[in-house]
């Protein structure tokens, strides 16, 4: 087909990309010309992915001392026992690195570097929920929070909603998926607003979107710099002190392999155990049970107020997942994983 005769066709152009890496780093550093990270030592986990070259460059140029791990991408080792999802499950590995090098905190990216989470000096995870709260406060104090609103998904911790209500920050909840968060932010951006505003949204996983006239999607490195900026401006001595102000509710997320995806509403034993959980946990705030859309797994989120512990929730999660497996013809003893969302780490079966 001769495209030259097609109406409405716009031709691209070839761009010499030899300096694009440097230009991106320059852009991030220039955006924070007044920010100095001197005196901070950061442990960077780059997931053997996209952040491997960029993250050490950016934080070093901003003045931080950096300790870098998992920054040797070889094509097949991306996210392999590295990066944000690994650290959420096994936080002890990064904590050992931080202790050895006496780092102030850890900064952890995923493979394509659109997500970032932190680890405070005590070894606790600072995830997307914490980051939304911290950044929401920061941008509102600066008078730059678009529509005084933060957007997140149904998987957010319940304490986040309470936190924003106490600070008169509006909260919009969407379905799970960054595309739904982005769609709500785009609606806010389309409304008349003062210049210099930032639309803030994201997910518990650490996918944070800072939307303005020049930025429209998640960028883990940019989010990380803003989070550290917010921490330094908070007056708190440690990241742990800042993150603890959010008081997250006990929350677990479980996943289990299933042989077949049978309508959960038709599984009598599953519904019976679900009703039992609701009766046994008077402080239960949310129970979300669904099949994965992409894997042969069932996923469960349990959350309760502080009358209950993470361990209590984990016990109930194992029981409900086992019931789903039994009712779907899944072999006994198949994969079940329960993640402590509140503090990080996998919870062993009791």
Q: Which sequence ranges carry the predicted segments?
A:
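Short hydrophobic/aromatic-enriched beta-strand-loop microsegments
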Residues: 63-70, 125-130, 168-176
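Predominant activation on well-ordered alpha-helical scaffold segments within soluble catalytic domains
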Residues: 26-29, 53-60, 91-95, 99, ...
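Phosphate-binding and adjacent anionic-ligand microenvironments
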Residues: 105, 145-350
């Amino acid at each position: 087909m001769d495209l030259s005769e097609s109406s409405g066709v716009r031709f691209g152009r070839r761009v010499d990309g030899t300096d694009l890496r440097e230009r991106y780093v320059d852009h991030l550093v220039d955006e924070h010309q007044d920010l100095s990270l001197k005196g901070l030592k950061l442990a960077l986990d780059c997931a053997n992915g996209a952040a491997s070259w960029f993250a050490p460059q950016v934080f070093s140029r901003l003045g931080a001392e950096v300790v870098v791990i998992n920054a040797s991408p070889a094509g097949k080792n991306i996210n392999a026992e590295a990066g944000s999802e690994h650290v959420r499950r096994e936080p002890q590995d990064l904590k050992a690195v931080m202790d050895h090098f006496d780092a102030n905190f850890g900064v952890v990216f995923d493979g394509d570097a659109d997500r970032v989470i932190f680890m405070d000096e005590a070894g606790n995870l600072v995830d997307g929920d914490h980051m939304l709260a911290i950044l929401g406060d920061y941008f509102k104090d600066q008078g730059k929070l678009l529509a005084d609103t933060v957007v997140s998904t149904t998987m957010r911790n319940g304490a986040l909603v309470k936190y924003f209500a106490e600070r008169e920050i509006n909260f919009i909840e969407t379905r799970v998926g960054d595309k739904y968060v982005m769609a709500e932010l785009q609606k806010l951006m389309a409304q008349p607003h003062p210049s210099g505003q930032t639309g803030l949204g994201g997910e518990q996983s650490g996918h944070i979107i800072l939307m303005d006239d020049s930025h429209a999607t998640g960028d883990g490195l940019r989010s990380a710099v803003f989070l550290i900026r917010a921490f330094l401006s908070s007056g708190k001595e440690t990241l742990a002190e800042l993150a603890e102000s959010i008081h997250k509710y006990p929350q677990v997320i479980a996943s289990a392999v299933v042989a077949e995806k049978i309508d959960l509403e038709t599984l009598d034993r599953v519904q019976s155990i679900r009703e039992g959980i609701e009766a046994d946990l008077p402080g239960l705030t949310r129970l979300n049970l669904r099949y994965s859309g992409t894997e042969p797994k069932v996923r469960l989120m349990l959350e309760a107020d502080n009358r209950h512990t993470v361990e209590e929730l984990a016990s109930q999660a194992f029981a409900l997942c086992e019931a789903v497996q039994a009712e779907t013809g899944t072999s006994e003893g198949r994969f079940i994983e329960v993640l402590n969302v509140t503090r990080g780490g996998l919870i062993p079966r009791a």
